[in-house]
Amino acid sequence: GENMLGFMKKKKEETISYGVIGLGKFGYTLAIQLAEYGYDFLVVDKDENLVQDLRTVTESAIVVDDYDKKSIKDSGVKNCDVVIVCLEEQLEKSLLVTLNLINLGIKKVISVADTSEHGEILEKIGAEVVYPKRDMAIRLASRLRANMVLDFVQVSEEINIYKASLPKPLVGQTVVGSGLRTKFELNICLLYT
């Protein structure tokens, strides 16, 4: 049937709508953040209590009996521009839901993976993959590596962005005079005080 709440009748073409499938720690936290940012989103989970909790931040919170093809289709996610599959601890369900979403024609499917093998399969199916545990471990290790590193974001395998305090030997030097680009292949994107 048609989706249960009439979710996302596409009011404005420029509005991006999100779907979150699976309300474990990652999915639940993601949904709360989407609400805080004021985004239009739908959540889908088998746990009625978790779905009920999120009805305080979105009217579009759907309980499903299973993550099968029909339940996912009937949930309303087909009206979302981006769907994030947060079933990383349920390998088979994660793969099947991701495949079903891609077959439904969802513009962008992002799936959370726990292992590199899981992620590799998701990529072959056609999903964008995120590895929250791995990424947070990398981020923490990078922060611990140098006390001057205040924050870190890995953009790609080759590109990292660091927020760092200025080392004392560089105080008073120009960007060119610091030699950061020539010695370390570092590009300074922003300076602030």
Question: Which role fits each region the language model picked out?
Answer:
Residues 4-19, 23-46:
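Hydrophobic, well-ordered beta-alpha structural blocks that scaffold small-molecule cofactor pockets
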Residues 48-49, 116:
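Helix N-cap at the beta1-alpha1 junction of Rossmann-like dinucleotide-binding domains, i.e.
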Residues 51-52, 119:
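Short alpha-helix immediately C-terminal to the canonical SAM-binding loop
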Residues 57-140, 165:
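Phosphate-bearing ligand-interacting subdomains
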Residues 138-156:
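A charged, well-structured terminal subsegment
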Residues 152-167:
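Internal, active-site/partner-interface "lid" segment
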Residues 171-177:
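A glycine-biased structural micro-motif
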Residues 192-193:
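Conserved small/polar residues in nucleotide/adenosyl-binding loops
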